[in-house]
């Protein structure tokens, strides 16, 4: 799903470059999107193989202490709106970004699988705001409740995660 949206973005940028090969905004956005796509492909591959530490590492970006892939996508969106590549009529484009939601899912799941609930919760909360029925959000919240000793609430959340998971199967 995320790659379909990204492919649409690449198609739009390629059309922009075709119309004006010297358009610096389109050139820069195209290079950034290719770099982001490469990092996301790595993260998806690690996720498919349940290599959760590697998922987080791939999403952190190439430079230590530099912007994460998530930060880079947010910046690309802001730049695209301010430069007119994306129409200003789109309300809160970052909130509608399939790529950002995919990254939130990857971070949430990777941290939950590593039992790093404190690191998972900010990502799972962002994801839950967009997709409140996401199974990984329920699992994260269940783990958080377990850690706080709220066992009945944890069981309820784990049951909801199971229901969502079964409905997707």
Model-predicted regions and their roles:
Residues 20-21, 67-68, 98, 132, ...:
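Short coil turns that delineate tetratricopeptide repeat
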Residues 3-4, 50, 115, 149:
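Residue-level detector of the short coil/turn that links helix A to helix B
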Residues 15-18, 64, 128-129, 162-163:
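Conserved structural position within tetratricopeptide repeats
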Residues 11-14, 60, 125, 159:
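Alpha-solenoid helical repeat scaffolds
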